[in-house]
Amino acid sequence: MTFDKIKVENPIVEMDGDEMTRVIWKSIKDKLICPFLELDIKYFDLGLPHRDATDDKVTVESAEATQKYNVAIKCATITPDEARVKEFNLKSMWRSPNGTIRNILNGTVFREPIMCKNIPRLVPGWTKPICIGRHAFGDQYRATDTVIQGAGKLKLVFVPEGTDEKTEFEVYNFTGAGGVALSMYNTDESVRSFAEASMNMAYQKKWPLYLSTKNTILKKYDGRFKDIFQEVYEANWKSKYEEAGIWYEHRLIDDMAAYALKSEGGYVWACKNYDGDVQSDFLAQGFGSLGLMTSVLVCPDGKTIEAEAAHGTVTRHYRVHQKGGETSTNSIASIFAWTRGLAHRATLDNNERLLDFTEKLEAACIGAVESGKMTKDLALIIHGSKLSRDHYLNTEEFIDAVADELKARLLKAKA
């Protein structure tokens, strides 16, 4: 049966990806998006061969288009290492597309679990979601690192604009064979945007907000994060938070990691770039699976976002797929990349029909899993060593099951 397509007034940016996620991405579009929406898609192929062919210009162009149209939906992509350079015969070991996009958009990545009642959690005490906000600019991800050969002095030098009066810090006096060195940075402007985005997210959810740093060791670097967050809170959010019955608090990263493990959830955790990289995967596993995690990059303007799956390109499954074998790849996080991006488009455009559609598609995913229709990774969490083939669906069967569930929900709403 055909459905009246919902008209989406403004375009979205689509960033295609690699390997198995590229395969499921097309299936999601063909079965869950295009049959129901009249949608203007600005398409960018971020698959590794096309990034190589364009000298990675396509990645920059996709980020610039996101700034123009405010909504991007991204498939998982390969970040090449030495082995990938050989495999694809690349011109260069291109940077992480996520890193490039995040640095252009200068946003905060918020990750949150997709909770299904029948999927057991490794941390059973987590009865409420934990939303982790990762500052997606600077620190180790924009650092200059080097191998030091031999003895010598390592210095850090700052030369203020318009003057020759430089400030010099002696970092270390190397003796013997040498070692390694790293210089990294962040900006007040970016940290302030991170603070605003985190405060806003927690306020929308009516959850408390925690910022974690190691300001006892990095007194100036992490201390700056702590001070700026406090300034932003006092100036713009304190009265709103008190009214909503929520709070903001700074905690040391080690203390916060321990607290997270024993808490029940139900808060936003603002992390510096590296901490957020690590802790978001820790949270995903604790809640059940990286395949059950949403990931949205929120920009400082509050109206530009990029939604993506929180996992990689599922290379192992792709190798099986290439040989014509059966795969059972979890597409939920990729489906939620589409729903979260389209939901934001709906909010910006004041499109209630589109917003309702995204809610029904998310409910269809969760409904399918809770009715026992799931991919192998989720079935394994439930059945463990007793897992058999009839416990799970293959890649396409699962997307078909979600499509059936979605159609049933749309028809029910029509009736």
Swiss-Prot record:
Binds 1 Mg(2+) or Mn(2+) ion per subunit. It is found in: Cytoplasm. InterPro entries: IsoCit/isopropylmalate_DH_CS (IPR019818), Isocitrate_DH_NADP (IPR004790), IsoPropMal-DH-like_dom (IPR024084). It is an enzyme of class 1 (oxidoreductase). GO terms for cellular component: mitochondrion. Mn(2+) binds at residues 254, 277. Its main location: cytoplasm. NADP(+) binds at residues 77-79, 84, 262, 312-317, 330. Pfam families: Iso_dh (PF00180). GO terms for biological process: glyoxylate cycle; isocitrate metabolic process; NADP metabolic process; tricarboxylic acid cycle. GO terms for molecular function: isocitrate dehydrogenase (NADP+) activity; magnesium ion binding; NAD binding. It catalyses: D-threo-isocitrate + NADP(+) = 2-oxoglutarate + CO2 + NADPH. It comes from the Eukaryota. NCBIfam families: nadp_idh_euk, PRK08299.1. Belongs to the isocitrate and isopropylmalate dehydrogenases family. This is Isocitrate dehydrogenase [NADP]. It comes from Nicotiana tabacum (Common tobacco).
